[in-house]
């Protein structure tokens, strides 16, 4: 499915149809979108993705009943036309980086163009959804008298259910990550730093088309407890655990989020690590069959939360599971503080656990990715497990 095997025009058409239906379901005639994940979803991939995460240089106006309009930087319009058949216009930059003290003025000009498109369609008096943007954008739209509503829930719920083509991409991206992890294991030897090991894992992923990772979560030895410590200059020793979370956004912008813990070298890793690994691995694989369509998020949280061994609850991971798409996204399955909703076929979910005793010397992270179907969940991540710890 990677590369030329994906019909990006059809992919875009399927996603747009879902977004437009979501707008209709929420009685929202239009939304102006700046979040790169949402813009990509209703139009096409952009360039400079990581920069776009903090700099709003492209946006889209999507309508419930009309074709969307994409505003693209002039230098990128040619690339966008190869991916998107709809209307594309050059942007009026308004970021402070590009506009300086003219930022507010430029934002007013850009949003006046958006407002004109609402007006000609008879939508200027209705609500306009918005996901996120710089303050100057909100001020400009407020100055035009636009009634803004939060479009993030609308788009996140739409994105949570994947089309068949999206599911195929998720499967393929997971396979590529599995292959990257297998190749990475050939380089997991004592004497290398965490930085070197993370670089090797990313090298193996990027050679298969990965776009970026959401984190640098790789730790070793005592830095595996507590979790969430990113790669450092620590030199990995014989017998150390090495734990990582891929958080990899792969080809076509779809996330493969899996975690593994391995033993580096030949020395005995010790009972503390074995116990932690068995607990994390066992929790995840015993939980996966519970992820069936119709199960509410609350039911899953209340069912699975008590299954985590008491010895590891003080430092448990905040999520039991979460949705995957353009990033870690809706829904989140938690122990408490549940939100409404239920699993549906087409959701892509990562199920995870961290096990490390409070005050302990090591810990283990384990995570798998699954597809929710009309029957049993489909496991799509198959990176090797650490047999020496089972």
Indicate where each model-derived feature is located.
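Active-site neighborhoods and metal-handling regions in enzymes and metal-associated proteins
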Residues: 1-390
